[in-house]
């Protein structure tokens, strides 16, 4: 599994990498580390502490130590309070505002996130149930052109299981967000109950 299979890097690219310390984003960081010297990449690891779990401070500290050990730039923020809006939407808006500020600070070419194939399926299913138009059925794009930079999701061709296998095979330490198991969040319910069924059906289709 090589990130170069899905994206063409250029020498001296500056990349802001959204990283939660979970298996998906740690896989992304590890893949980028493996090619950093080849392309002389400048990697800025961006972490947002959502401040909803007591373990989140331990995770942030681990990620800082990991970045120090690997000579990676590390930037972090803590969300001190939320409004009354949808939690996931509000957290996402805060994250991307933070990422965009870092892109400007470092004059980055790219913002990379660890969204994978399962995330894409979840998004499509949620939009279908909510009555999205045909454009919504395509989910999110692998590359999005922004003002002066691009958002890139280079892991979109892999499943979550493949990324979990990757971090275990490469001995990459990661943390698991326990809040992902809570049924009160809509996306979690899709992830726990609908996605396994989709994979089951997919495995039954002759290839």
Specify the residue positions occupied by each region the protein language model found.
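Core alpha/beta nucleotide-donor-binding catalytic domains of modification enzymes
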Residues: 1-193
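ATP/NTP-dependent adenylation/nucleotidyl-transfer catalytic domains that generate, transfer
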Residues: 185-207
């Amino acid at each position: 599994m090589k990130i170069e299979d899905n994206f063409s890097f250029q020498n001296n690219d500056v990349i802001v990498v959204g990283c939660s310390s979970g298996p998906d984003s740690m896989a992304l960081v590890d893949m980028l580390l493996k090619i950093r010297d080849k392309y002389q990449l400048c990697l800025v690891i961006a972490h947002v502490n959502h401040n909803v779990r007591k373990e989140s401070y331990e995770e942030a500290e681990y990620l800082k130590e990991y970045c120090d050990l690997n000579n990676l730039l590390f930037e972090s923020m803590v969300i001190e309070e939320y409004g009354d809006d949808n939690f996931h939407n509000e957290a996402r808006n805060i994250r991307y505002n933070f990422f965009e500020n870092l892109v400007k600070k470092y004059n980055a070419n790219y913002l990379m996130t660890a969204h994978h194939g399962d995330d894409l399926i979840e998004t499509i299913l949620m939009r279908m149930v909510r009555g999205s138009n045909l454009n919504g059925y395509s989910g999110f794009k692998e590359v999005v052109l922004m003002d002066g930079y691009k958002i890139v999701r280079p892991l979109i061709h892999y499943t979550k299981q493949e990324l979990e296998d990757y971090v275990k095979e490469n001995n990459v330490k990661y943390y698991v967000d326990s809040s992902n198991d809570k049924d009160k969040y809509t996306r979690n319910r899709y992830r726990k109950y609908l996605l396994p069924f989709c994979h089951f059906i997919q495995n039954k289709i002759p290839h």
